[in-house]
Amino acid sequence: MNRNRYRFLLGGHDLEMNGIGKMLRQNRKIVYDLHLSWGARLSSYTYVLNSEDTFVGIELTEDIPPPAHYIAIDHHNENSHKASSIEQIAELLGIKLNREQQLIAANDRGYIPAMIEMGATPDEITDIRCRDREAQGITEEDELLAEQSIRENLSTEKDLIIVNALTPRFSAITDRLFPFEKLLIYSNDSLTYYGRQAKAIAGLFMPLVEKHKAYYGGGENGFFGIAQNSMLPEELQQIKNKLIPLLTNLTK
């Protein structure tokens, strides 16, 4: 397959997606970037799709049939066993990742534990996490609301930490609470569990994953979440009420 015919479609922005875009542009690849958020859909790029070129969709939900020549790049949900997206793109193009790109890959693949495992320094971890939050669009107000959420809305059930978030940007909360074994963060329109046996928990909700109402990633002990605005508040409350006893009774 001719690498020069690839047309890259960028998904929701975070530090990894920014890094992918930078790497592609440095290598003079054709990139389409609509600066989408998490949960980005292939249909956003309908205006560029055709049956001649090979399109590479990066972390895009396939809400429409993909074009005739299409490569899907992702490492979430059913693709959670794969390398990070930036690593997959590097392999596709025969590019060797530098230290910064390796840190970005580890962060996106397995959060802080994966960076620690690859030998990242505390300063490198702090830098990557700050840049990732910024790339996600987290504002100073979000950071302050995260602190307020922890200060005023944190509770525990056995070894489970539960936070009622005042900001939809949950990573501003997770970064402040790390290290943790089991963390559940929720708001009026979304919910995410981080920690022990997250992939196994996701397995109990596969019908929601298949309907794109839920997602998971980050390995066995990564995360499982309900997509923002994917269900009614009372439905979300029911899932939270089901999750808490499950999570508090997890065995190691």
Where are these regions (language model features)?
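N-terminal small/polar loop signature for handling phosphorylated ligands or for N-terminal nucleophile
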Residues: 32-67
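Internal, active-site/partner-interface "lid" segment
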Residues: 97-155
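Gly/Ser/Thr-rich loops at beta-strand to alpha-helix junctions
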Residues: 11-17, 61-63, 77-79, 107-112, ...
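Short, charged, surface-exposed secondary-structure boundary motifs
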Residues: 19-22, 40-45, 80-88
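Gly/His-enriched, cation/cofactor- and phosphate-binding structural elements
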Residues: 2-10, 69, 94-97, 155-252
